[in-house]
Amino acid sequence: MKWLGLLGLVALSECLVTIPLMKVKSMRENLRENDILLDYLEKHPYRPTYKLLSGQQDPDVSFEPLRNYLDLAYIGIISIGTPPQEFKVVLDTGSADLWVPSIYCSSPACGKHNTFNPLLSSTFLVSGRPINIVYGSGRMSGFLAYDTVQIAGLVDVAQAFGLSLQEPGKFMEYAVFDGILGLSYPSLSFEGITPVFDNLWAQGLISQNLFAFYLSSKEERGSMLMLGGVDPSYYSGDLHWVPVSRPLYWQLAVDRISMNGEAIGCDSGCQGIVDTGTSLLIGPRDPVLNIQKIINAQHSHGGEYIIDCDTISTLPDIIFTIDGVDYPVPASAYIRKSSVHGCYSNFDESAAHESEPYEVWVLGDVFLRLYFTVFDRANNRIGLAPAV
């Protein structure tokens, strides 16, 4: 049996391609420091499932309701075109499309980011097809194009991607990243588009139809996206495999959520979305408000919940029970220390809609920094193990 386990690790690590990730200051932190966070929160309430459950009324619009940009904190470097033009992108399991700003973008935010110039690429092809992607924070409008995308030395030929002509809101000016590279299922992408990861697999550029994230909590660098394999040195113990419950997002069934031995949400089971595109733990209003009360978090005029930093060591873990296995998240993880204003709760409430058929939680970077995560497309499952 030990040999079988060893062979499994060797198989998972075969032909591994790694992409270093940089941890950057999130837009939330930038907005807070510029005293406009409350304005953002009032204009863009977080609603993770409403648009999908209510249906996509416009076939020419791709809805990405999970994405509100606010807490995206890990970025990687890709290039597009021949010769290559470089971009900082969020590698995001909560969306499926690739887009970057174009030189034709009229939004003020585009002036503060790298923009793609089609005139400089000999491999560029334009489709002429408009593209509109609705996020939690507004609409990205632009046009669809094709070009060579390079990621960690892998050359993805004729990749479809969006070029923005307009980006949502003045808040994007405070984003450190240029664009988004989605890693969710193709069913979430703009209609008919094959996502980057699917093209890498189809073109034989990776040896296995899976990828994995290691998000370091200790330093700016050290985080990693692994394509086509898994490096077992980044986790301890064995991977626990959980089936994807709905192959749209990377979604799984959660048995229970508890603190101090008592259920605080998900009493009859619920759904969890594993999302590298947010830093927070996000759930329905009532259980999240209950958590804020348990940890004695006080609502601030800035729209967030403040906690006395001296109490962190006394606060309980929150435990997510998934497929019979407990995944504790300690207070040191669910409370963040700000360089400016003390300590804040990393719990946030979704603007849930009464038509939603089930309770949904989003397990963001707070969770993923603790648990190495494998996204296995071949078997529609997620692997979890304690990160080292």
Swiss-Prot record:
Q: Which coarse location class describes where this protein primarily resides?
A: secreted
Q: Which PROSITE patterns match?
A: ASP_PROTEASE, PEPTIDASE_A1
Question: Which Cys-Cys disulfides exist here?
Answer: C105-C110, C266-C270, C309-C343
Keyword check for Transport: no
Q: Which InterPro entries match?
A: Aspartic_peptidase_A1, Aspartic_peptidase_AS, Aspartic_peptidase_N, PEPTIDASE_A1, Peptidase_aspartic_dom_sf
Task: Tell me the Pfam families matching this sequence.
Answer: A1_Propeptide, Asp
The protein's GO terms of the molecular function aspect are: aspartic-type endopeptidase activity
Family according to the record: Belongs to the peptidase A1 family.
Output this protein's name: Pepsin F
Q: Which organism is it from?
A: Oryctolagus cuniculus (Rabbit)
